[in-house]
């Protein structure tokens, strides 16, 4: 299996090289050269546990890693999850399920991909006898999950940019209280979009990337999206057979990577009926899927901070398929978008995609309603998924974070403050963070001084 850039101006790579590279040298994002058809394999995959299913799925793409080695990497990636199902599918009512994706070490769905990515990096460092420096930007959960995927690993250093004062206190503590010498929490003055823009400019500096063997953990990394395909497949296989063909996955998302993974799985032959994109008040994706226009707005802080995003980095992968896999067209559109901050899609399948937008008042109301009706405590991001469910479909709401990560919001909504032992332990640890300006030069200078 080879992987190509959405912009078509760089050679195709094998899996390990595409993962290590992160962002393609031409500024594009890697995708499989061909999309495999899994439809004939679905019956064979039924009944597999999560790690075994992930091994079988990743084996289709990671063809340059021996099967036994890949199996060990995958198995090790899910040993720190606290629920034996890894991704339990909870029925709440007839035709309504919650897929819990927060039983990993940082209590967020990002652990599914980033525990695996950390082990893939460790394998590459050992196999190639090289060090690697990892750079990422986060609006909340990605940074903590990336750090806990690489914490203390020999031959690695990880640098995570996040908007100072715009992540929850617990999210910041998960990044800045590790005490690990290879972890650097970089609090930048600006928004997540500012951090992501600076990150892309740093990666565009080919000399700097090469000198420091720089790689990415953001959802621009191919391995992230592929790993996230697995929990859609796992949930689909655990639904009653009569419900599978009518399932709509409801996905709280700001960066589009989570829903993109499900859509890619659908393109691999898994019969998923549709996807509902659930946004908070930062609603660029809601506007895209209701009007066809993708236009950047101003980021507004919300009760669901991990979705406080206006530039979705995985937009380019969706664009590549929507524009008929035409790299020249992708280059032209991305240049136009960079210049104007807007793009209008000529068409997309509105029967597959729908969207909802939830403001802070509604988030609090939905948390209370879901708790009252179903006895279920949803975090603020998951709450966005419960708005305007389609009664004609089987709804699977992706629960993307533990409610314990947002105690103030939950307490205000239902009068009970959720807790988790791993989060309580963080409160006594010192915060070690580095405040930086959100400029490529400042970030490069810091990495120069700390890289392995």
Predicted segments with their positions:
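PLP-dependent amino-acid enzyme catalytic core
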Residues: 1-452
């Amino acid at each position: 299996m080879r992987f190509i850039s959405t912009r078509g101006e760089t050679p195709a790579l094998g899996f390990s090289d595409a993962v290590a590279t992160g962002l393609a040298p031409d500024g594009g994002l890697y995708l499989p050269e061909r999309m495999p058809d899994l439809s004939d394999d679905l019956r064979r995959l039924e009944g597999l546990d999560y790690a075994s299913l992930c091994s079988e799925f990743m084996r289709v793409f990671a063809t340059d890693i021996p099967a036994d080695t890949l199996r060990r990497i995958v198995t090790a990636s899910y040993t720190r999850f606290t629920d034996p199902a890894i991704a339990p599918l909870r029925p709440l009512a007839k035709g309504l399920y919650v897929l819990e994706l927060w039983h990993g070490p940082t209590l967020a769905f990002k652990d599914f991909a980033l525990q695996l990515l950390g082990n893939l990096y460790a394998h590459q460092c050992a196999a190639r006898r090289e060090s690697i420096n990892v750079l990422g930007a986060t609006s909340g959960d990605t940074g903590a999950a990336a750090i806990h995927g690489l914490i203390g690993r020999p031959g690695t250093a990880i640098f995570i940019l996040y908007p100072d004062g715009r992540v929850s206190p617990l999210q910041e503590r998960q990044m800045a209280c590790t005490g690990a010498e290879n972890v650097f929490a970089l609090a930048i003055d600006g928004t997540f979009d500012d951090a992501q823009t600076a990150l892309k400019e740093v990666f565009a500096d080919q000399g700097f990337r090469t000198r420091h063997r720089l790689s990415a953990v953001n959802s621009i990394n191919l391995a992230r999206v592929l790993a996230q395909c697995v929990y859609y497949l796992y949930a689909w296989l655990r639904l009653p057979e009569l419900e599978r063909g009518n399932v709509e996955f409801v996905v709280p998302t700001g960066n589009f990577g989570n829903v993109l993974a499900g859509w890619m799985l659908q393109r691999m032959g898994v019969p998923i009926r549709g996807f509902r994109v659930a946004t908070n008040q930062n609603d660029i994706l809601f506007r895209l899927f209701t009007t066809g226009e993708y236009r950047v707005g101003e980021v507004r802080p919300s009760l669901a901070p991990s979705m406080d995003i206006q530039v979705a980095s995985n937009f380019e992968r969706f664009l590549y398929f929507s524009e008929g896999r035409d790299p020249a067209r992708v280059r032209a559109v991305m240049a136009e978008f960079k210049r104007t901050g807007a793009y209008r899609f000529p068409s997309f399948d509105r029967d597959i995609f729908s969207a909802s937008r939830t403001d802070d008042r509604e988030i609090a109301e939905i948390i209370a309603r879901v708790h009252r009706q179903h006895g279920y405590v949803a975090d603020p991001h998951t709450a966005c998924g419960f708005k305007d469910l389609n009664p004609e479909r089987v709804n699977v709401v992706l629960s993307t974070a533990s409610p314990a990560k947002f105690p103030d919001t939950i307490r205000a909504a239902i009068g009970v403050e959720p807790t988790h032992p791993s989060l309580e332990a963080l409160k006594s640890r010192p915060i070690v963070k580095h405040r930086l300006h959100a400029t490529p030069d400042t970030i490069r200078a810091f990495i120069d001084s700390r890289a392995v």
